[in-house]
Amino acid sequence: MNLHAPNAEQDDIEYVDVCAVDDLWDGEMDVFDVGEHEVLLVKHEGRFHAYDGICPHQSVSLVEGHLTEDGVLICKAHEWQFSVEGGQGINPANVCLQSFPLKVEGGRVLIGTEPLPKEGEA
């Protein structure tokens, strides 16, 4: 089952098993080394989301921030805000988080080793 719907073919993606589905409670997040990337895994409203774990502003680990009940991920350094649904910037609106493909199989969460192309990239 794929609980994150990327717009990319997933047949040739290499995935890494990072945790069990039950390891993260709703509203929790954790960071994992996946390939050469630090990837933030967030569970919100029963769905998993995977993003680059480093804030695009000043390279602060996003896992040190917090997730609001309404799905806003806030960086601890300068309170940049991102929607957990898709990684779109809220404050500032012109910046977004890099998404990673993920899937759930056999009660395990697997994250792709390479980020998905940003919108407009091939």
Curated annotation (Swiss-Prot):
[2Fe-2S] cluster binds at C55, H57, C75, H78. Induction: Induced during growth on aliphatic alkenes (such as propylene, ethylene and 1-butylene), epoxides (such as propylene oxide and 1,2-epoxybutane) and chlorinated alkenes and epoxides (such as vinyl chloride, cis- and trans-1,2-dichloroethylene, 1-chloropropylene, 1,3-dichloropropylene, epichlorohydrin, and epifluorohydrin). Repressed during growth on other carbon sources. Its cofactor is [2Fe-2S] cluster. It is found in: Cytoplasm. Binds 1 [2Fe-2S] cluster per subunit. Signal peptide: none annotated. Keywords: 2Fe-2S, Cytoplasm, Electron transport, Iron, Iron-sulfur, Metal-binding, Plasmid, Transport. Its main location: cytoplasm. One of its GO terms (cellular component) is cytoplasm. GO terms for molecular function: 2 iron, 2 sulfur cluster binding; metal ion binding. InterPro entries: Rieske_2Fe-2S, Rieske_2Fe-2S_sf. Residues 16-111 form the Rieske domain. It comes from the Bacteria. Homodimer. The alkene monooxygenase multicomponent enzyme system is composed of an electron transfer component and a monooxygenase component interacting with the effector protein XamoD. The electron transfer component is composed of a ferredoxin reductase (XamoF) and a ferredoxin (XamoC), and the monooxygenase component is formed by a heterohexamer (dimer of heterotrimers) of two alpha subunits (XamoA), two beta subunits (XamoE) and two gamma subunits (XamoB). Ferredoxin component of the alkene monooxygenase multicomponent enzyme system which catalyzes the O2- and NADH-dependent epoxidation of short chain (C2 to C6) alkenes to their corresponding epoxides. Functions as an intermediate electron transfer protein. Belongs to the bacterial ring-hydroxylating dioxygenase ferredoxin component family. This is Alkene monooxygenase system, ferredoxin component. It comes from Xanthobacter autotrophicus (strain ATCC BAA-1158 / Py2). The gene is xamoC.
